[in-house]
From Swiss-Prot:
This is Gastrin. One of its GO terms (cellular component) is extracellular region. The modification Phenylalanine amide is found at residue 33. It comes from Macropus giganteus (Eastern gray kangaroo). Belongs to the gastrin/cholecystokinin family. Its main location: secreted. Keywords: Amidation, Cleavage on pair of basic residues, Hormone, Pyrrolidone carboxylic acid, Secreted, Sulfation.
Length: 33
């Protein structure tokens, strides 16, 4: 389960792994919880 304070770190970690996100991924992918 995610918490609001985890999002900045989570988004940074995902961006390092995936590289530049497509807009769909940025808008919906990490919100799938």
């Amino acid at each position: 389960q995610l918490h609001p304070q985890d999002l900045p770190h989570l988004m940074t970690d995902l961006s390092k792994k995936k590289g530049p996100w497509q807009e769909e991924d940025a808008a919906y992918g990490w919100m799938d919880f």
